[in-house]
Design a protein with these regions (language model features):
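Hydrophobic positions within repeat-based interaction scaffolds
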Residues: 155, 228-259
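Canonical positions in the second alpha-helix
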Residues: 192-193, 227
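Intrinsically disordered, low-complexity protein-interaction/activation regions
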Residues: 1-188, 226, 254-313
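TPR/TPR-like (Sel1-like) alpha-helical repeat modules
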Residues: 139, 212-236
Length: 313
């Protein structure tokens, strides 16, 4: 029976029973309470926390009353949705509330997060064909950002966490495609990654390499220009030395794709290069901060001089 239930939090919130959408959970506060309990199902949630969270603009007595009423509506709604599924029963005590953890098998966010953790620690050359399928399935689950259209603070924090995992999975899919010379698919995943993170210099480099190795040197060079524009508009910085070096190699047609199979699983040169990128960026930001500080000091000095002139006057 539980296998028939599917709860979607990635994208627009929905509850499905088999192939039919369940409309029994109607009011927004009931939905908010359910979704919060689902997202934070690993720990009991105190009534006080829930009442403050969902009715922060109301006095404690009123917010606690609202919680009791909403909780009652949620219980009724869950019972109407599928009365024979014990996983949808709430564990309710005088001070805390928790939804049964066996609900995990019904949640898209659980499957997505499990897939992410299966591959998170693996280098590109360690990713297997099974890992590739796992990542593709996880990406397919990501039908949109978490609870699209919701703007509560707790929701925004969780949304950003899932966005980060999604981008990391896309990055690994691009890496896998590069290693296995599946350039067209790698470019498709890279395009989606840049659609969501336009200023990802790493993704731009991946796209430059993929275009070049696919035999499209012109697009590889265009990709550098897109990277340069994105970094300038989004961050106000120039491409890093690593990106410029790649561009120059592609422009002179001297770029040599790495022999992925021959390399060890832990490529110290890549780690050093990535570290150099970070150091370079920190140096750029340090210079920017120094300029800003000098500008502020000049402005403060001008204000002090003006103040002194006014006092004398």
């Amino acid at each position: 029976m539980l296998a028939l239930l599917k709860i979607t939090l990635l994208g627009k919130f929905s509850v499905m029973w088999g192939n039919e959408k369940v409309d029994g959970i109607q009011t927004r506060k009931v939905e908010e309470l359910l979704c919060y309990l689902l997202l934070f199902r690993d720990h009991p949630q105190s009534r006080e926390t829930l009442s403050k969270l969902l009715w922060e603009d109301q006095p404690p007595i009123k917010s606690k009353k609202n919680l009791r009423q909403t909780l009652s509506r949620l219980q009724d709604a869950l019972h109407q949705v599928c009365p024979d599924v014990p996983a949808l029963k709430l564990n309710i005590e005088s001070d805390w509330i928790q939804i049964d953890s066996s609900i995990d098998s019904c949640l898209d966010v659980v499957a997505f997060e499990k897939s992410y953790h299966l591959v998170a620690g693996k280098q590109a050359r360690e990713l297997t064909d099974d890992d590739f399928v796992t990542m593709q399935n996880a990406i397919a689950l990501y039908k949109g950002d978490l609870l699209e259209g919701w703007y509560q603070d707790w929701c925004a924090i969780e949304r950003e966490r899932f966005q980060t995992m999604y981008l990391a999975l896309l990055d690994k899919l691009v890496q896998y495609c590069e290693v296995h010379q599946n350039y067209d698919l790698g470019l498709a995943y890279g395009t989606e990654l840049l659609r969501r993170d336009r200023a990802s210099e790493r993704a731009h480099r991946q796209m430059m390499r993929l275009h070049y190795m696919a035999g499209d040197r012109t697009q590889a060079l265009y990709q550098y220009e897109r990277c340069k524009l994105a970094l300038d508009e989004e961050l106000g910085v120039e491409p890093s030395k690593r990106t410029i070096d790649l561009y120059q190699q592609i422009r002179s047609d001297t770029y040599q794709p790495p022999l992925f199979i021959a390399k060890p699983a832990t490529d110290q040169s890549e780690i050093y290069s990535a570290f150099s990128d970070i150091v370079g960026r920190l140096e750029e930001f340090s210079e920017m901060l120094t300029k800003i500080e000098l500008h502020v000091q000049e402005e403060m000095g001008a204000l002090e001089n003006a103040h002194g002139i006014l006092k004398k006057a």
